[in-house]
């Protein structure tokens, strides 16, 4: 469950290491984001040689949350961290590699490129 001011790790090779959620997209009063949701975020930590710089405002899709997500079959899935993948204007990933596992809910949200780049889909 991601809300404003939540800090997330970046699970791709764009050069950004940590982002902070500014807004959850999808409705004027929407408060929380979960796996597969798109957020607007500010880059808080970044590598100096990366594509994304510190202070830049980006869109990202949440791929892992520490708060468990209930699936339709009743099972729960939870990760050790909150993580996101940075997107461009066409909602395609900016990076060329994804690090760590990705939840299956990302596939249902229509981010097939992220699912194909991920080393593991849980």
UniProtKB/Swiss-Prot annotation:
GO biological process, one term: translation
GO cellular component: cytosolic large ribosomal subunit
A single MF term (Gene Ontology): structural constituent of ribosome
Statement: the UniProt record of this protein carries the keyword Cell cycle: no
Family matches, as Pfam families: Ribosomal_L14
InterPro entries referenced in this protein's UniProt entry, alphabetically: Ribosomal_uL14, Ribosomal_uL14_bac-type, Ribosomal_uL14_CS, Ribosomal_uL14_sf
The organism's place on the tree of life at top rank: Bacteria
Similarity annotation: Belongs to the universal ribosomal protein uL14 family.
NCBIfam families: rplN_bact (TIGR01067)
Function: Binds to 23S rRNA. Forms part of two intersubunit bridges in the 70S ribosome.
Quaternary state and interactors: Part of the 50S ribosomal subunit. Forms a cluster with proteins L3 and L19. In the 70S ribosome, L14 and L19 interact and together make contacts with the 16S rRNA in bridges B5 and B8.
UniProt protein name: Large ribosomal subunit protein uL14
């Amino acid at each position: 469950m991601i809300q404003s001011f939540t800090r997330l790790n970046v699970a791709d090779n764009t050069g950004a290491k940590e982002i902070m959620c500014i807004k959850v997209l999808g409705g004027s009063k929407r408060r929380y984001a979960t796996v597969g949701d798109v957020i607007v975020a500010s880059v808080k930590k970044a590598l100096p040689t990366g594509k994304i710089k510190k202070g830049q405002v980006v869109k990202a899709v949440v791929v892992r949350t520490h708060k468990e997500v209930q699936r339709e079959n009743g099972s729960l899935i939870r990760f050790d961290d909150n993580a996101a993948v940075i997107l461009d204007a066409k909602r395609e990933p900016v990076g060329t590699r994804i690090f760590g596992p990705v939840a299956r809910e990302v596939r249902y949200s229509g981010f097939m490129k992220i699912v194909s780049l991920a080393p593991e889909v849980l």
